[in-house]
């Protein structure tokens, strides 16, 4: 059957009788976003791009959030020298100059802008044209090149198929060419600088207007969201049933601190102890509670130099309270409720000493990773210590469904082939070689970040590696700023003050720089940033180490998932080497704990279609090959690997 016959049969299926069997490649389709059905506009566009020998796109709006998920595919097309023409507009000054510059930087793409002001007319086209031989696949409908339009919005598009001589293709391509060659259409060099200036003026005006409408959080009577309401309801039931222990399992960034504060307010507990393992976190938690309670209860710290023992609500570090001079300030019934943050550590001796001292009405544990624990008590686990009373559980997948987290764009990128599992000293020079550093910087610049500057965390295999890579980064000019990168290595020997200073510098804006303190671009670390660190501004996470467990992988990915103003998404760059545990990456991302090899393979191929919301998952071809080899070799019955 030739292509014309295939096309006739496809049209019969689409327009006359849906029961007629035909080749889906030649069948017109309705294209929308519904991840539960494995459908995303983005995935369809990606597939067509990878098959075509030429593409043309005409859309009103282009943003970084829209093109970032396509960057890996577009880079592959550049390598194959597949030509592309992209036409956009200055309508409403909405398209982001940063995105336009990124597209224009690809050697195979020609970018033009239609000037609606000069033409004195609107521009609302949303069309994607893909040519393969003599056949055109054309997607027309409602989707611009923006993040939500391509992944999660309610969008209606149709994919039509036509030969190059078909009337539909002829008319659409003719119209594209008319706009492309219009006197009101300008090449990148002719429009970019003027448009960038106009865009920045309009953006500044919008930002000012937005700020005028914002009222500080402290002026609101904060109310719990749906997740927090469900948690409080379940917690009440547990207490009413006579239980005195409960566990909240909540993915990083979903608001478990506020959930606990709302619960304490709802339950009317007069005295509460909140235990954390970092002084910075104690201070942050206290501020969150103050927003919920305002001045209805007194609050104090027992950490660092603070000794505010008699406050109604005490926020303490485990390390401080574990010492007798502080612990013995309290009798066993001093608190109505004791909250244990990062509760997967409660099996450790330091926590157990505190737990044996107190007898509150309620022990409340909170963790994102209950299956990760300190095995200091033989046979005990976190669930058992909280009497298997789970007040609420929300894992990464559900949190994304509920839009509680910042969307992420994950890219599995091939690490240099010289990197293997052996991290002995003789391999250290390879891990920190100039070639690898160049590779990392090239990819981090290409895939970028959301916002005005990079605020990144880089996870390495060893302390020595963090120090050497940070040193090398600091001697290399950042192509975006024209200045050398500003990074530090932060590890276990860093003081509380050093950590706090590093976190503040990473969050700083360029205009806040002074002679005493400069902003940071990256913090290098091994493990100390895995948990208990809330830097909401993080917009890029780079993984330079093998994945040892799905739990640690999600902890490190989670460092970038907190929402923040001006942060539309976070970019996750995972440099994948020849590691035997590569199969853990799709297991971690999918949340699928069936350990079915076919399911894991399928996620590598189709994860981008089924991940909730605006988040996306991409693996380059070599990374896919390495993961598939790892899956084939792995023994999923060996629980130690899981």
Go through the PLM ranges and name each one:
Residues 191, 198-224, 235, 439, ...:
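Long, largely alpha-helical accessory region at the distal end of helicase-like NTP-driven motors
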Residues 388-457:
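Conserved interdomain linker/interface between the two RecA-like ATPase lobes of SF2 helicase motors
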Residues 272-281, 432-474:
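Conserved strand-helix element at the start of the C-terminal RecA-like helicase core
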Residues 550-555, 559-589:
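Conserved segment of the helicase C-terminal RecA-like domain
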Residues 1-225, 229, 344:
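PLD/PLD-like phosphodiesterase catalytic module centered on the HKD motif
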Residues 344-408:
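Post-DEXD/H (motif II) to motif III coupling segment of the RecA-like Helicase ATP-binding lobe
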């Amino acid at each position: 059957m030739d292509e014309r016959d295939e096309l006739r049969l496809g049209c019969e299926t689409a327009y006359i009788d849906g029961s007629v069997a035909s080749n889906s490649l030649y069948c017109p389709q309705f294209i929308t976003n519904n991840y539960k059905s494995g459908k995303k506009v983005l995935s369809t566009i990606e597939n067509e791009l990878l098959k075509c020998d030429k593409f043309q796109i005409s859309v009103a709006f282009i943003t970084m959030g829209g093109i970032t998920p396509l960057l890996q595919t577009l880079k592959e097309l550049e390598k194959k020298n597949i030509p592309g023409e992209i036409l956009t507009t200055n309508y409403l000054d909405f398209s982001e100059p940063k995105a336009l510059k990124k597209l224009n930087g690809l050697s195979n793409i020609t970018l033009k802008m239609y000037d609606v002001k000069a033409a004195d007319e609107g521009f609302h086209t949303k069309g994607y044209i893909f040519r393969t031989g003599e056949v055109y696949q054309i997607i027309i409908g409602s989707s611009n090149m923006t993040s939500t339009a391509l992944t999660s919005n309610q969008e209606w598009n149709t994919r039509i198929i036509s030969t190059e001589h078909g009337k539909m293709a002829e008319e659409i391509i003719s119209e594209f060419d008319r706009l492309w060659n219009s006197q009101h259409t300008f090449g990148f060099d002719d429009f970019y600088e003027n448009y960038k200036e106009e865009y920045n003026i309009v953006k500044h005006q919008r930002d000012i207007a937005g700020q005028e409408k914002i009222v500080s959080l402290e002026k609101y009577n904060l109310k719990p969201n749906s997740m927090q309401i469900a948690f409080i309801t379940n917690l009440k039931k547990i207490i009413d049933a006579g239980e005195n222990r409960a566990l909240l399992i909540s993915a990083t960034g979903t608001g478990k601190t506020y959930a606990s504060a709302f619960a304490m307010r709802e339950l009317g507990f007069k005295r509460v102890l909140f235990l954390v393992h970092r002084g910075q976190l104690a201070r942050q938690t206290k501020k969150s509670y103050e927003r919920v309670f305002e001045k209805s209860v007194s609050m104090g710290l027992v950490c660092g130099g603070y000794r505010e023992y008699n406050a109604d609500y005490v926020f303490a570090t485990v390390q401080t309270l574990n010492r007798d001079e502080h612990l013995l300030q309290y009798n066993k019934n001093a608190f109505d409720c004791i909250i244990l943050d990062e509760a997967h550590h409660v099996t450790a001796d330091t926590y157990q000493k505190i737990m044996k001292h107190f007898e509150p009405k309620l022990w409340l544990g909170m963790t994102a990773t209950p299956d990760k624990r300190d095995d200091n008590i033989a046979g005990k686990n976190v669930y058992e210590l909280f009497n298997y009373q789970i007040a609420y559980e929300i894992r990464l997948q559900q949190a994304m469904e509920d839009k509680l987290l910042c969307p992420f764009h994950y890219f599995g990128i091939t690490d240099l082939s010289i990197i293997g599992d052996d991290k002995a000293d003789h391999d250290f020079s390879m891990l920190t070689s100039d070639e690898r550093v160049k590779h990392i910087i090239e990819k981090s610049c290409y895939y970028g970040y959301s916002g005005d500057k990079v605020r990144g965390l880089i996870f390495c295999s060893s302390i020595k590696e963090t120090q050497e890579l940070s040193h090398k980064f600091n001697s290399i000019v950042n192509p975006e700023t024209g200045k050398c990168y500003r990074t530090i290595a932060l590890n276990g020997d860093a003081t509380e003050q050093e950590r706090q200073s590093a976190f503040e510098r990473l969050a700083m804006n360029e205009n806040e720089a002074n002679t005493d303190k400069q902003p940071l671009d990256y913090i290098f670390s091994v493990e100390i940033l895995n948990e208990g660190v809330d830097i909401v501004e993080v917009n890029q996470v780079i993984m330079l180490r093998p994945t040892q467990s799905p739990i640690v992988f999600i902890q490190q990915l989670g460092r970038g998932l907190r929402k923040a103003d001006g942060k539309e998404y976070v970019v996750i760059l995972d440099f994948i080497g020849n590691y035997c545990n590569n199969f853990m990456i799709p297991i971690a991302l999918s949340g699928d704990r069936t350990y079915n090899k076919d399911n894991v393979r399928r996620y590598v191929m189709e994860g981008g279609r089924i991940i909730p919301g605006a988040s996306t998952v991409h693996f380059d071809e070599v990374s896919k090959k390495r993961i598939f080899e790892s899956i084939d070799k792995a023994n999923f019955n060996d629980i130690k690997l899981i």
